[in-house]
Design a protein with these regions (language model features):
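Structural preference for solvent-exposed beta-strand-turn elements
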Residues: 1-372
Length: 372
């Protein structure tokens, strides 16, 4: 069953901008809360939308048709990608339809983009409140703070990083190998490890009531959220090896090519310069990447400005094209180290994954798909 709700574009964009400003100020103060991930919770009965990233939260009034049929639900989107989309759209009401992906309609056009956390509900592509896992907060934060202490004093890893929790279907296990069982029978559909910012451990532990230690943990995409009563806090994940939310909805052929990082980076940089002449800094900057035998064609054309780059790559598969936001592509390549990068494409209706040659670092870029 599809879930549909409507929100004003201007109100939503202003809320996103304010959250980004809060996160950027916090980051400037060393709190490391860049809004890479937005957690969106919709209360079906109260017709309210809660948008949060880091410690910043905004509530927005929305309209949900047939609200009696819907419980509260939540889903995730990438922050900068979602913000760029909103800025590119004109004023007016935006209607969101959630299936395996999200369709955003503004009357004249429909924008389709992938949402995070869809693996539990393949039919509708969302998570509900039933996917919060109940844990003992007193034990959780005691373990996490002990790990921070070990990192700071023993120099096990960079002090800004805490390899905090291993996740399995039955329990959480901190890296001191002491098991911490879940209180409820909530289902965790994967095994893996997540990586948290150290500063979040200390700040979050002081937010919650130690005399009432039971709380809930929610992990979705690039964020881990904590909830106890009326207190909620979220932190972005600095890294993880599971769950693989990027491949929740794989569609189209999956192909991999290898390319020289500097060659693609310079081509993307030249395209950024051209794009700013025609589109301006505040607009969505769509670019197409086409793979053919041992070639990648990067093409940008808008409002009379255009550029085409042909890059040598290692690729012998079928021709394939994806449409992306140029700035996000440039940032992703710039953040990858090494001489050689691997690019995984799943077609126009999915995403691309860019990794370094040995697979230690990964960036994921959602697609742009406009249907008029």
């Amino acid at each position: 069953m599809d879930i549909t709700f409507t929100a004003g574009r201007d109100v939503l964009e202003k809320a996103v901008s304010r959250i980004i400003s809060v996160c950027e100020r916090a980051t400037a103060e060393g709190k490391n809360l860049l809004p890479y991930f937005f957690h969106i919770r919709v209360d079906g009965y109260g017709s309210a939308l809660k948008l949060s990233a880091g410690n910043a939260v905004r509530n927005i009034e929305i309209l949900i048709p047939d609200v009696s049929e819907h419980e509260a639900f939540c889903f995730g989107v990438y922050g900068s990608y979602f913000h760029n989309i909103l800025k590119a759209l004109p004023s007016g009401d935006l209607t969101f339809t959630l299936r395996d992906v999200c369709y955003m309609h503004n009357g004249a056009s429909t924008l389709k983009f992938q949402i995070l956390g869809a693996n539990q509900f393949p039919a509708v592509g969302i998570r509900t409140d039933h996917d919060w896992w109940e844990v003992n907060y007193r034990e959780l934060f005691s373990r996490l703070k002990r790990l921070v202490y070990c990192v700071d004093t023993q120099g096990l890893i960079n002090k800004n990083y805490v390899k905090a929790i291993h996740i399995s279907p039955e329990n959480f296990t901190c890296t001191d190998n002491r098991r911490m069982s879940l209180i409820s029978n909530g289902i965790i559909p994967y095994n893996g490890r997540i990586l948290l910012p150290a500063e979040s451990v200390s700040s979050f532990s002081s937010l919650f009531d130690a005399n009432s230690p039971t709380g809930f943990v929610y992990i979705d995409g690039h964020a881990m959220s904590f909830s106890q009563g009326n207190i909620h806090a979220s932190t972005r994940l600095l890294g993880y090896d599971a769950p693989n939310f990027e491949s929740v909805i794989p569609k189209g052929p999956c192909v991999v090519c290898e390319a020289d990082r500097d060659a693609i980076l310079m081509a993307a940089k030249r395209a950024v310069i051209v794009a700013k002449k025609g589109l301006g800094k505040e607009s969505l900057q769509p670019i197409s990447l086409t793979l053919s035998t041992n070639k990648m064609h990067m093409n940008l054309e808008n409002q009379g400005f255009g550029i085409t780059e042909n890059i040598d790559v290692k690729y012998l598969g079928p021709d394939l094209t994806v449409h992306l936001d140029l700035v996000l592509l440039f940032q992703a390549i710039k953040n990858i180290a090494g001489d050689i990068i691997k690019i995984e494409m799943r077609g126009d209706n999915a995403q691309i994954i860019i990794t370094d040659h040995i697979g230690d670092h990964r960036n994921v870029i959602m697609p742009i798909l406009l249907a008029r």
